[in-house]
Amino acid sequence: MLPIIVLIGRTNVGKSTLFNILSKTRNALVADYPGLTRDRNYGYCYLKENKKITIVDTAGINFKSQKIEKQSHEQTLKAIKECDGILFLVNARDGVMPEEYEISRKIRKYEKKTILVINKIDGIKEISKINEFYSLGFKENIKISASHNQGINNLISKYLTPWINSKFKEKKLEKISQEHSKKEKNSVKIACIGKPNVGKSTLINSLLMKKRMITSNKAGTTLDTVLVPIKYNYKNYIFIDTAGMSKKKSKTNKIEKFCKIKTLQTIEKSHLTLLIIDAKDQISKQDLLLSSFIEKSGKPLIIVINKCDLLSLKEKKNLENLIKKQLKCNFFSKIHFISALNNEGTVELFKSIDTSYHTSQKKIKTSQVMKIMHKAVKKHQPPIINGRRIKLKYAHLGNSNPIEIMIHGNQVKNLSLCYKKYLKNFFYKTLKMNGTPIKIQFKETMNPYISKK
């Protein structure tokens, strides 16, 4: 296992900003808004080219009694228990706050290596304000400005690297890092998307068989995208929990806008997508828009109807027929009825995930593509335009993931949408794509008998 460093501190001290800089990603949502991070968010920091450590972004520690804050607090404590070291972040502009003495006491109970990171030092002229933090009693401390990338190299080279080298043998860590990178590369990435409160986080907890994600009846509990590795039947998967896609448009809510953008980016980066629908709400306009975006992204789609324990067999059948009717223009492999809370029907998901993933990765030969095109044309010829029949000459694979087929011919720009759809469906059924969308591009071939001027 890679060494684990956890980022701890109050809300809005810059943990997510530092997490993004150390991991060289934008995985953690950052805004001037307290309580944005709720679940543990894992990333990787490379100390050298072949040597990396795990870093964990956590929710800001506060001592409120609300349910979500309590669950966030529990997640942070779990991160401290499993880690090898702690970066305790404080805000230089605020000075020492009373909660930070309480946080210090909690950290010391676990007897973990701790480095005090005094963040947001840019523009601070009062040295006495920074010196206040020494009263927290940590021997090792460093001053940085995460948002200005100031002091980050010192943090890595003078603090993290020497400590990791003293605790872990270099060659062993390099080997672990390489094995981990290989495992991550071979993992199937699955985006879990849907409206707020449909049970995305509950589903991941059910598959993992432990409470990894924060859940509640309150819509919008998950704000960030969170990657959760799961091993099942000796295979590695990464499930990505996302913020619920709400149909409400709020001009003032920038957080909601950022969440939507990150969810759409997650779909594009994943191998396949689970569209989760609440059995009580049935399928909505928002679900249809999401399924359309998934198809345009070229990702396999699996429909998951959650909370199906509330439906009778007849209601399930009616809902299944309704979804098939509403999504008749979209490609999806299967409709799964589950109850994530009761762990019913969740194991069957892995079979569909494996089938859809392997289908999307299949290699298609040019000869096979040509053969299918000729079969399609023989069965239903292209239309005649201006006295001449549109001629499809040859076809080949343009891209493999997402699958894109290039068809060359004469007058292909005049092909009707109806005929294009016919070709698309013909290729889809013949290749047995099983929920994986196909893109078809048409290219006009040059007539060699027309002289070039």
From Swiss-Prot:
GO biological process: ribosome biogenesis
Domain KH-like: 362-446
Keywords for this protein: GTP-binding, Nucleotide-binding, Repeat, Ribosome biogenesis
Family note: Belongs to the TRAFAC class TrmE-Era-EngA-EngB-Septin-like GTPase superfamily. EngA (Der) GTPase family.
Binding site residues for GTP 2: 194-201, 241-245, 306-309
Residues that hold GTP 1 according to the record: 9-16, 57-61, 119-122
Record InterPro entries: G_ENGA, GTP-bd, GTPase_Der, KH_dom-like, KH_dom-like_a/b, P-loop_NTPase, Small_GTP-bd
HAMAP family per record: GTPase_Der (MF_00195)
Domain EngA-type G: 3-167, 188-361
Protein name per the record: GTPase Der
Subunit record text: Associates with the 50S ribosomal subunit.
Top-level lineage group: Bacteria
GO molecular function: GTP binding; ribosome binding
Organism ancestry: Bacteria, Pseudomonadati, Pseudomonadota, Gammaproteobacteria, Enterobacterales
Protein purpose: GTPase that plays an essential role in the late steps of ribosome biogenesis.
The keyword GTP-binding appears for this protein: yes
